[in-house]
Each structure stands twice: as structure tokens, then as C-alpha cells.
Amino acid sequence: MQLRCILITLCAVLYRFANAESLYDAQDPIVELETDTFNAAVYNSEKAHFVEFYSSWCGACIAYAPTFKEFAKHLAPWRPLVQVTVVNCADDKNMPLCREHSVNSFPTIKFFKQGSTSKDDGQQYTGNKYEINQMELDVAAYLHASYEKDKHRLAGIFDPVDNTKTLEEMWASAGSANLLGIASQEDPALMPWALIINFHADRNVKVVLARPQHPVVVRALESESNGRFLLYKRGDITPIWTSPAGAKWRDIQEKVNEYIAIYGVDAKASLVEPQAPAPVANVDMTQFQVQLVDLKSTIFYMLFKEIPRRQFVEGDDLVALKQWMRTMSKYAPGTTPIRRLLYRMNEWIWSLGDKMDTNDWTNKLQEVQVSLGNPLPDKVEWIACIGSKPNLRGYTCGLWTTAHAISVAAYKAEKNNAQFNPVNEVMEPFHQFIFRFLSCGECAKNFNKEAEKHKLLQVKTAHEMVMWFWRVHNFVNARLSGSRTDDPRFPKRQFPPSASDVLHLLVLAV
């Protein structure tokens, strides 16, 4: 009997790996290659390739996928010169390819220069793959070095302009572009190289490298200045924008794109025939509904992605996680198997000492997940929290939904309990989890400020707790309304949208 169970389990595992699903999809600016497409795409190509070899069943790869997707989005304009690529080594048909490239751990990232001819041309990336800005600069350095070494036909784009060259002469090489960017830096000129690659195929702007002592730079900045960027509009002799000291290349890129929208070669046409403004979105009641699918996706992402992002959890972080798991096990809504999963994980984490290896966490979580029939999904899916774009709403919406659902569940369970302490039982555990484990660092810091500003620690009753979450949520929505994180299809609104909707929405939410 025991052998039969082992064989059944082994077959299930083999089937799972043979039919491995990708961590990436068509919406990502990433090319997924396989054994039968890798050589044709990478070898003897005009483009360089930056390749992540990953396993779709590897916890580290699952946690890293959002980072690599974000990195690929940033490098989307670089695709004429370098392509971000992935290979799923968990897929049986790709195992020979991964062995050929000596991929022994996941994720492994390699740079293949343009014109590569074999596996030996792959350079393993040894930098910090979690530091996106630095990885982008490292790719620029790889490309610059390979162009220089191979005397590539485009190697000249990285050459600094001669110190004798005037601003007018720089414009002469700008073609029909209305904007000229001068990036000032000594070697290694990582910021200029990245910007030159980024805008290489953009007809709106020409970016050139100049040394800090170039007369045009000195005149504009009144001194030699390393690591600065000057943006000129055609016809002007003074820059319309100068980067602050220490600006990252991507911040400069975003600023240049803002000016392209105003002064680019297509800007006049858009002014002559302006597009009709997008219609004001009416209140869509579904955006205020609580959907079990959203809650399950949020809990899945929280447990499987957010918590295991670090190798170890210890000290105050572990205390905070224990408190949050206790809150979840008591008040998180969901199916009976989900509540059992949270209860068992809470029992397990409280049995630990002062340090938790997140590999142990993931293993235990997977063990409990399987034993309960996989009550949580293996990927996120959004209904009420779906955004018009993949990067909008989703998990952050799900977090707010979970907070509201837990606060309402706690209210219903404890409203007549005079001993109930909403701060200790619900609010502070949620606050500390967000502050310590939310992968959006800036979001975590902002919520920490909101908790202090709105006096979280002074909440006394279950009713005040429910209202506190809505008050803070409304405040955050007001602050972020119209920002880049606002979804035009589901604008950030105050809750409830009108007094007449209160009863309807409460019925939906509870």
C-alpha cells in the first residue's frame, strides 16, 4: 500500500513537471524560448539576449518573476538592441538545453552578446538581480563592452562627443529630432550608455555622451559636473531641463518622455487633432464587491510570494508574522479548507523559536496545501480587483479587500465581547505585516505613516476598527486619485460613492 502511494505521488510529480506552466505571459515584454527555438533566436542574431533560466516550480523563481517582469518592462525600449528572454527548465523538453548551458541552480541569468555562436558565449550575470536599476546599468555595460570589443557597426553611438564640438554641431547629428539630450559622465558612463540605448530608435530625441569638462556642459552647469543630463529643445541655447545630481537613468528617461509628449515630432499633430477625452467613468458597483476569488488570490500571494521573499524571518519580523497569522486564522474569510490551512500554519509558526527559514515555511505551506486538496489557487486571478492593465489594482486592491473583510468578520464575532482589543487582535498585526512584508517598500512606509497619522493605537471598539479601515482607505484613495497607480476604468473613489448605495454595498461586502 505504501509503495502504491509513493508511485502515485511520483507520477503526479512527473506529470506536473512535464506540463510545467510558464511564470510569464504574452503581456510581458519577454520572449520565452524553448529547446527548438533557442539557437535560432540567440545565435547569429543582430540583437544581444539577456536570458533567465528558471524553474516554474522553484519558489525562488516564482518570487523573482515579478521582479524580472518589471525589469523587462523597463528595458522594453531597448529591444532593437537587446532582448530580455526566459527559458523554463522545469519543462521536460527544455532539460537538455538547460544542462547544455550548465544551469545548476535557479534562477540563473546569462548575457549573450549579439552574434553569439555557442553556449560558450554566454556570460553568467553575477550582480544583484534584485536591484533592478543596477542590473539595467549592467546590461548597458555588457552591450557597450561587446560593441567595443567586436567593433560593432553601432559602436560609435557610445563615443563621447569631442570637446571642440559646439551645440549647433551636436544638433546636426540629431536628424529631425526636436530634442537633444547631453549625458555628462566619465567612464564607466553607465547612465549615458543606458539612455543612449533606450532612445536609440526614438526619432523624437537624440542622446549623446559628453565628458564633464565639455564646454557646453560647463556653460550650462557653471562647472564640471559628473553624472548630469541636459535636455535641449531645438532652437534653444539653454537646456529646458537639467537632471538633479545623482538622478537614476530611469528617472531621467521618464522626464525625457514627458518632454517628448510636449515637444516630440508628433506633438503638433496631436494638438491640431486632439483625441476626445476619455469619458468619465461611472461608478461600477462591482469594484466595491468582495469576491472569494480575490480573497483567495490575495492570501495565496501573501503566503507564497510575499513572505518567502527573504531567506530568513527573525526577531521583530517573526513576532509580527506570528501575530498576523493568528489574526488570519481567527478572522480571515474563506472556505473551510482555507481556514484550516491558516489554522495549521498558525499552529506551526507559533511552534518555532526565534528564527524561521522561509524554505521551511514554503515546504510546510505546500505540505498543508496539498493535504487539504489545494484550497488556494496556484496563480492569482482577480474579479472585483481586476485592473484594466496587469500592473493596476490586483494585489493591492486585494489587500484592502482582505483588511475590510477581516475587520467586518472580527466585528461580527466580537462586537459583544467587552474584552476584545481591536488594536492587538486585528489592527496592529495588519499594520506590522504591511510595514514589514509588503514588497512595495514605498507603499509599506506610506501605510506606516497613515497608521500614525490616523491614530491606529487609539482605536477602542470593534465598530471604530471597521470605520478606521474605511477612513484610511478613503484618505489613501484621495491622495492617489489621478496618479499613475489610478486605474481609469476603476478610478479611486470615496466609499460609499453615495448615501443611497450604503445598504446595497454592505450586503455585497458582508
Features from the language model and the residues they span:
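Alpha-helical bundle/repeat cores within regulatory domains of eukaryotic proteins
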Residues: 405-510
